[in-house]
Amino acid sequence: MLLERVRAGSEKAAELCPFPRSPEIPLCAGCNQHIVDRFILKVLDRHWHSKCLKCSDCQTQLAEKCFSRGDGVYCKEDFFKRFGTKCAACQQGIPPTQVVRRAQDFVYHLHCFACIVCKRQLATGDEFYLMEDSRLVCKADYETAKQREAESTAKRPRTTITAKQLETLKNAYNNSPKPARHVREQLSSETGLDMRVVQVWFQNRRAKEKRLKKDAGRQRWGQYFRNMKRSRGTSKSDKDSIQEEGPDSDAEVSFTDEPSMSEMSHSNGIYSNLSEASPALGRQAGTNGGFSLDHSGIPAQDQYHDLRSNSPYGIPQSPASLQALPGHQPLISSLVYPDSGLGIMGQGGQGVPQSMRVLAGNGPSSDLSTGSSGGYPDFPASPASWLDEVDHAQF
């Protein structure tokens, strides 16, 4: 901006001065003192002494032009250095009148546009590589550096440890898997190995031990699951073999092995005296005739205490007999079956109630009935025949 010089006491000064005919004297923005000089400089509505208006950076006294940013006043060069476009190499401002070089979005001074390795200034047409930090490298130096890096990253030779050194390290590891620094220094001096080599050896050894323990645990669990699978397979094969075995196999379940009714002791007196001599409960085997009974008459009323309504050993009654029998009529409680028994008399016999009749003869079956033609079949010879030979159609 152009500086405005006002002469004190003149008519022009009276027109331009913001304090015409004012008793107050303006203060200088630089030294904060009253301005009583002949000339007053005015910049952005602020008054300055001629000697106080200077560049904030180079302290050059400004006479014709100045540049302002914030509260500072600058000359042209310093203003563009501070607030203008900066060089990507030296981070200094570039004046608008200076010739520059550009690489992508970066701007360089002419003397800053050079290789950082050989310091050679790059000219128009030269090939170069732009690094990530905006630095420049010529093609020759870049290829050389890349080749050296490839050679340096080649596989280094492995460190060889002798048997004696290995024994010393193993003994130290057995004492302490993670030794302190002074112990490693002592081992390094004893074995002649580098401190770094000793430290890496202990690290590798600890990692190896940890890996071996982990593998051992996996093997134990694997063996456990294999044994479980093998045992399950064996039990399954045993079941299959039992199903495939014939009737003579040990796995067959036979009812003939069970104890006979004569060997079973029940609280009820009905089955207490059954004998093997009468295979069909008193009748001859192979016939459907009557059966023999040995008794001394009809038992008294007090002999039926073993038979109750909820007793599991009571003689079942046919549905037809429920109506004909008197209420709570006692049944036969104790039966004795000797080898040669006496037959019970037929219908109308003395001593036998009319409501209960025991039919004897060559009829189709023995029956306990009240005149009904349909009754229960004879008791079979053995428990096995109860399950196999009973005709359920009769029920």
UniProtKB/Swiss-Prot annotation:
GO biological process assignments: apoptotic process; inner ear development; medial motor column neuron differentiation; motor neuron axon guidance; negative regulation of apoptotic process; neuron differentiation; prolactin secreting cell differentiation; regulation of transcription by RNA polymerase II
Main location group: nucleus
Polar residues bias: start-end ranges: 257-276
Pfam families, A to Z: Homeodomain (PF00046), LIM (PF00412)
Chain intervals for the UniProt region annotation (Disordered): 209-325, 348-395
Record InterPro entries: HD (IPR001356), Homeobox_CS (IPR017970), Homeodomain-like_sf (IPR009057), Lhx3/4-like_LIM2 (IPR049594), Lhx3_LIM1 (IPR049593), LIM_Homeobox_TF (IPR050453), Znf_LIM (IPR001781)
PROSITE patterns referenced in this protein's UniProt entry, alphabetically: HOMEOBOX_1, HOMEOBOX_2, LIM_DOMAIN_1, LIM_DOMAIN_2
Superkingdom as given in the UniProt entry: Eukaryota
GO terms under cellular component: chromatin; nucleus; transcription regulator complex
Cellular location(s): Nucleus
Residue spans binding DNA: 154-213
One of the record's GO molecular function terms: DNA-binding transcription activator activity, RNA polymerase II-specific
Protein name from the UniProt record: LIM/homeobox protein Lhx3
Annotated source species: Gallus gallus
Gene field: LHX3
